[in-house]
Swiss-Prot record:
Protein source organism: Anopheles quadrimaculatus
Gene: ND6
E.C. code: 7.1.1.2
UniProt protein name: NADH-ubiquinone oxidoreductase chain 6
Keywords noted in UniProt: Electron transport, Membrane, Mitochondrion, NAD, Respiratory chain, Translocase, Transmembrane, Transmembrane helix, Transport, Ubiquinone
Transmembrane annotation, as ranges: 4-24, 25-45, 48-68, 82-102, 143-163
GO molecular function, one term: NADH dehydrogenase (ubiquinone) activity
Family: Belongs to the complex I subunit 6 family.
Membrane topology according to the record: Multi-pass membrane protein
Primary localisation category: mitochondrion
Length: 174
């Protein structure tokens, strides 16, 4: 159920992102989308340290993009559209209500699932973390780790190339 709600919020944020015009609001939506994606990754993998590292990497990339876009954009005032905010909240609540109306046993499953998670959380925490950390470096998931290493290296090269003193689009800081 939690996964379904997070995916719904990600979908709504994706639709809102297309309506944004200011770079600051786009960055905020992208940061929120990244946070929710990392949260969803942590729920699926059952350990949150990988999603924490992924979030820090994307946050570093977002800071670089923020500096780059801020140096190129004009100095216009940032205003929030309350119509868009209320519309997105309304869509979120309607979609959540729609999920509950479609499957009435979903509420019962949600409540029993929470009770079972509370019961089994203390018993299996240590053993599950050891098994899931071992699984991360085995064959299918080691490709994600290699992709992450390559992404970090590429981000490092692009950052060094962009921020050279006389070659980049950044304004000089006085």
């Amino acid at each position: 159920m939690t996964k379904l709600i997070i995916m719904t919020i990600c979908l709504i944020i994706s639709f809102i992102f297309m309506q944004m015009k200011h770079p600051l609001s786009m960055g905020l939506m992208l940061l929120t989308q990244t946070f929710l994606t990392c949260l969803l990754t942590g729920i699926y993998v059952k350990t949150f340290w990988f999603s924490y590292v992924l979030f820090l990497i994307f946050l570093g990339g977002m800071l670089i993009l923020f500096i780059y876009v801020h140096s190129l954009s004009s100095n216009e005032m940032f205003t929030m559209s309350f119509n868009l905010t209320t519309l997105s909240l309304l869509i979120f609540f309607l979609m959540t209500l729609f999920f509950f109306i479609i499957d009435k046993s979903l509420i019962e499953q949600f409540i029993s699932n929470m009770e079972m998670e509370m019961f089994s959380f203390n018993n299996n925490l240590i053993n599950e973390n050891i098994l899931f950390l071992n699984k991360m470096y085995n064959f299918p998931t080691n490709l994600i780790t290699l992709l992450l290493i390559n992404y970090l290296f590429l981000t490092l090269l692009v950052t060094v190339k962009i921020t050279k003193k006389f070659y980049g689009p950044l304004r000089p800081m006085n």
